[in-house]
A protein has these predicted regions:
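Cys-His-centered catalytic/binding microenvironment captured across papain-like cysteine peptidases
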Residues: 2-47, 214, 220-229, 233-274, ...
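N-terminal-proximal low-complexity accessory segments that begin disordered
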Residues: 27-28, 33-74
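Internal glycine-rich, Lys/Arg-flanked active-site/core loops of soluble domains
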Residues: 57-213
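Intrinsic disorder
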Residues: 147, 179, 196, 223-226, ...
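Conserved structural-core and active-site-/substrate-pathway-adjacent residues in large, well-folded domains
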Residues: 153, 181, 232, 273, ...
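Alpha-helical transmembrane segments in eukaryotic/viral proteins
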Residues: 281-310
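Extracellular/lumenal N-termini and interhelical loops of multi-pass eukaryotic membrane proteins
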Residues: 308-324
């Protein structure tokens, strides 16, 4: 595997970060070293869900003038996809994920590179040519079960600690590839052991394992969806020039990413634990008991009242007879 192929998963390489004016050079970074991209307010990713669900070839047709030799890579992705893909995906859905993971030959930029660059742009109209592919790609991703909550890692070859004080709300607008293996990031080929480095430790709740659908089947890649919303929990500086930023994913109050189809679950369903249910059962049981107790007390009081009234009239009658 070439160096730049693994850079796609794990780190940002400042030397390879390109502007939109130089689209013929591969962007190896999946996280830009420009920290402002994490905090800038963007419009939500919406509109693509209205597109029809098309085969991969047709879904990629609007991108033929954007991505070099796209048809060749689409064919590679389809040929590598088994007839019965895992996770109950269709061939085109699985191939859409596989196409995302393929690295274009240099100096041309890959699909993941151009797509993520466009997702981080403020101009959402620039994203429109990707809508048909996004419909297929995200339909495939949401069919893959979310991994249980776990900690994943990403690395940046720059000190970004000052940009992430505790309590800061962070949104990653691109598809974000992470690894569960910290030893991968320690490899000298990627982050290395010297120079400014920032490690992001992220507690994720809706990551997807795409290894069964990846062009690189040896990569344990966890993919986060656009609009991943997080809060900075803490920071750590365990070694010179090494900074660790602890992030915790939260569900945003507003829609940042439109689901690809009606009923699609971007986040795992929250299961109510027994002790939470008990919080509601106990007050209801208590109220029912109060009503029953009140009814019993009322009946007893009524009987006593009736007894007292009966005794009064009996005495009254005896006194009347005595007087007569």
């Amino acid at each position: 595997m070439e160096d730049n192929e693994y850079y796609r998963i794990n780190i940002s390489n400042t030397e390879n970060y390109q502007t939109s004016e130089n689209v013929t050079t591969e962007e190896n970074a999946i996280i830009s070293n420009d920290a402002n991209e994490f905090n800038m307010e963007q419009n939500p990713v919406v509109g693509y869900s209205e597109e029809p669900l098309l085969p991969l070839v047709k879904a990629c047709a609007p991108l033929s003038n954007i991505l070099h030799d796209l048809s060749t890579y689409v064919e590679i992705a389809l040929n590598e996809t088994p007839e019965v893909p895992p996770d109950e995906l269709t061939i085109d859905e699985s191939a859409a994920i596989r196409l995302y993971t393929i690295e274009w030959e240099r100096p041309h930029r890959s699909l993941y590179s151009m797509l993520n660059y466009t997702l981080k742009m403020a101009d959402r109209e620039a994203l429109r040519p990707y809508f048909k592919y996004l419909k297929l790609f995200l339909t495939a991703l949401v069919k893959i079960p979310c991994v249980p909550p776990l900690t994943v890692w990403r690395g940046v070859t720059k000190n970004l600690s000052e940009e992430f004080p505790p309590g800061t709300v962070v949104t990653w607008w691109s598809f974000s590839s992470c690894t569960t293996s910290l030893t991968v990031l320690e490899n000298n080929m990627y982050l290395g052991y010297t120079g400014d480095r920032t490690l992001f430790s992220v507690e994720v709740i809706n990551g997807r394992i795409i290894r069964p659908h990846s062009h690189f089947i040896t990569e344990d890649e966890i993919l986060l969806l656009p609009g991943t919303h997080m809060v900075v929990q803490s920071q750590l500086n365990p070694a010179p020039d090494l900074y660790i930023v602890h992030l915790k994913q939260i569900i945003p109050e507003e829609t940042l990413l439109e689901p690809p189809f009606e009923g699609a679950e971007l986040y795992p369903k929250i299961k109510k634990h027994w002790y939470r249910k008990k919080r509601f059962i106990i007050p209801i049981t208590f109220m029912v008991a109060l009503v029953i107790a009140a009814a019993i007390i009322g009946a007893i009081v009524g009987m006593r009242s009736a007894v007292k009234k009966g005794k009064f009239w009996m005495i009254f009658k005896l006194e009347v007879k005595r007087l007569l």
